[in-house]
Design a protein with these regions (language model features):
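Class I S-adenosyl-L-methionine-dependent methyltransferase catalytic core
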Residues: 1-170
């Protein structure tokens, strides 16, 4: 009998925002952020994307282009759909570079799809501490990965090695 594999239990709350130091490193690698397709005004106060799509906007139904930062909703099927969309938009050239923060669920289809296009991946040491407005920061139940899709894995390594192991393609 085959069992379905899944990541560690989720909190059920998709509104956990990226630690600012990770955002600063991603912004440095990308040279700015044109789009965050899974955001909120509160998160964008740190992200600083030129354009955001919120849950109300339905980022999956909107156009994606340029340099993208993405910390997708971790609940399924949203994470799968956002990662598939990023992989497609990057392969087609609409997205020119991207940094995506996800659980390090390397066994999943969505991780394999977007990870298969990544020029580099950072596996942070320890668990990142996500934040919410008005709440204490918290670490998730499993580790994360930051995947880089773009032309400059050397710059990604230089910025992200301070967070943990960085693996690049040859």
């Amino acid at each position: 009998m085959r069992e379905k594999t899944s990541a560690a239990s989720e909190t059920g709350d998709n509104e956990w925002y990226t630690p600012p130091d990770i955002v600063l490193a991603a912004r440095a690698v990308l040279g700015g952020i044109d789009l965050d397709p899974a955001s909120s005004p509160e998160a964008n106060a740190v992200i600083g994307a030129s354009r955001i799509w919120t849950a109300a906007d339905d980022g999956l139904a909107r156009p994606w282009a340029g340099k993208v930062w993405m910390n997708p909703p971790y609940a399924q099927p949203a994470c799968d759909r956002f990662c598939a969309r990023l992989a497609r938009e990057y392969a087609e050239g609409a997205v020119t570079a991207a940094c995506v923060l996800v659980n390090n669920a390397t066994e999943t289809t969505w991780f394999q799809e977007v990870g298969g296009q990544a020029a580099a991946v950072c596996f942070p040491r320890g668990r990142l501490r996500f934040w919410q407005p008005g709440k204490e920061s918290a670490a998730p139940l499993q580790g994360q990965a930051v995947l880089y899709l773009g032309p400059d894995p050397v710059a990604f390594r230089a910025e992200f090695v301070k967070f943990g192991i960085v693996v690049t393609r040859r």
